[in-house]
Regions:
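N-terminal beta-loop-helix "entrance" segment that forms/cooperates
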Residues: 35-51
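Catalytic binding pocket for nucleotide-activated donors in carbohydrate/polymer assembly enzymes
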Residues: 4-7, 11-14, 18-23, 28-37, ...
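Active-site proximal beta-strand in glycosyltransferases
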Residues: 73-88, 103-106, 125-128, 155
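Short acidic active-site motifs
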Residues: 47, 69, 92-93, 282-283, ...
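Nucleotide-sugar donor-binding catalytic core of glycosyltransferases
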Residues: 2-12, 121-122, 127-302, 325-328
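Glycosyltransferases and closely related glycan-assembly transferases
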Residues: 52-58, 68-80
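Short N-terminal targeting/anchoring amphipathic segment
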Residues: 3-6, 50-65
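Structural motif
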Residues: 6-10, 62-66, 85-86, 106-109, ...
């Protein structure tokens, strides 16, 4: 097929393109949003239509969902394939999600169950994938100096979410509501496998939050996104992620030497060793491969799905210790291909065990790498995607 891919510089776009080409497809890239992060609707239309004409495109493809691309595909009678790799993706609640030209693939089974009711024939559950060959090449070419530099007992690469937490911009909430929300967030922080926040938000509470938030994200009149869902997933979900990551690393850094690579401010966690940012495609794989334990606390808006980072870690043959996510159990064996925790106390206990049993870490990391190399590569996942998409109607 001739595939037009609309890019915005997602970390997995290059891997998807390599996978598509390996399957024999011709790929044409629209890079408008790589260069301009806020293009107008007309600019998107012009760039995509020009790309369609140049490539004689059979389908339009993107990482995450773009309502504008769905509308273009509908008008030009093409299929639009989108692979959801993040959460929350509020665009999924656009009225365009009902378009029959859509083929939407969602990595989180809970989110899939929520969204698929709007277009049941054309929305699918599909886990993410691993780019094993690419990452292994980076590891093989690592210098001795880099191996020494990036070898750690316990490491984490990623944001603490403290610098990108929209919840913190709310002003003048009443003490009662502020305290209630804090209690909900502290409770949800400790619970894995079930996201209950939205159930505990009254309409009155949501209205007060919206009233006190300058620039609250509001969906269009015909869209499917409610103010309550926006508050639960976008504002509160990201805030809980920030709280959990700060609390987790503050707790662990008092007991272990923990190395982190992040642009987030870690001054509140003085014993945490923050090395700043690293290069995603060259240095990060070495950290993953050479760390005894790679921690991966999942962003709370990912309710059940396996984050892309876990596939990246396993592709690098890194040992993964992550929180419980229900979808994990469908694809991996805890204690054999990675390991999971359900509380901060269990996390501490498992860290102590694995630091004194590094041979077990290496064996589990090897098993996890073998699993993703065999069953979770991009070419395999993209083949699954197209098989599912081809058997559904427009």
């Amino acid at each position: 097929m001739n595939i037009l891919i609309y890019r915005y510089n997602s970390i997995c776009e290059d891997a998807v393109i390599r996978g598509l080409k390996e399957l024999g497809h011709t790929v044409y890239e629209v890079i408008l949003e790589v260069e301009n992060k806020s293009p107008s609707g007309q600019e998107i239309l012009d760039a995509v239509v020009m790309g369609m004409e140049k490539s004689n495109a059979d389908i339009i493809f993107s990482i995450n969902y773009y309502p504008a691309l769905s509308e273009i595909a509908r008008v030009y009678k093409l299929l639009y394939y989108s692979w959801i790799v993040d959460a929350p993706v509020l665009e999924l609640y656009s009225k365009t999600i009902k378009n029959r030209c859509n083929r939407v693939f969602i990595f989180d089974s809970e989110l899939y169950r929520e969204i698929s009711v709007y277009n049941p024939y054309n929305i699918f559950y599909l886990p993410l994938a691993s780019d094993c060959d690419f990452y292994q090449k980076a590891i093989r070419h690592a210098s001795l100096a880099d191996v020494e530099k990036y070898t750690h007992n316990i490491s984490f690469v990623g944001s603490l979410y403290t610098e990108k937490c929209p919840y913190d911009k709310v002003k003048n909430l009443s003490p009662k509501i502020s305290g209630y929300l804090h209690g909900i967030m502290k409770a949800q922080e400790k619970i894995y496998g079930y996201y209950f926040v939205e159930e505990l938000l009254s309409d009155e509470l949501v209205d007060e939050f919206v009233k006190n938030y300058d620039g609250y994200y509001l969906a269009g009149e015909e869209d499917l996104l409610t103010k309550k869902r926006t508050l639960a997933q976008f504002y509160i979900g990201n805030k809980i992620t920030a709280m959990e990551r700060v609390d987790t690393f503050k707790y662990l850094s008092e007991k272990f030497e923990v190395d982190i690579y992040t642009a987030s401010d870690t001054k509140e966690i003085p014993k945490l060793k923050n090395h700043g940012t690293i290069m995603t495609h060259t240095q990060m794989p070495i950290v993953f491969n050479k760390s005894t334990i790679n921690l991966n606390p999942t962003s709370k808006p990912i309710r059940s799905g396996i984050p892309l980072r876990i596939f990246d870690l396993l592709a690098c043959e890194g040992f993964v210790l992550c929180n419980y996510q229900s979808d994990l159990l469908n694809e991996f064996l805890p204690g054999e291909e990675l390991d999971i925790y359900s509380s901060i106390e269990e996390l501490e206990e498992k860290i102590r065990y694995y630091l004194s049993h590094t041979d077990v870490c290496r064996e589990i990391a090897h098993n996890g790498h073998e699993k993703v190399s065999k069953y979770h590569t991009y070419p395999l996942r993209l083949e699954q995607m197209f098989r599912l998409g081809e058997h559904r109607r427009r």
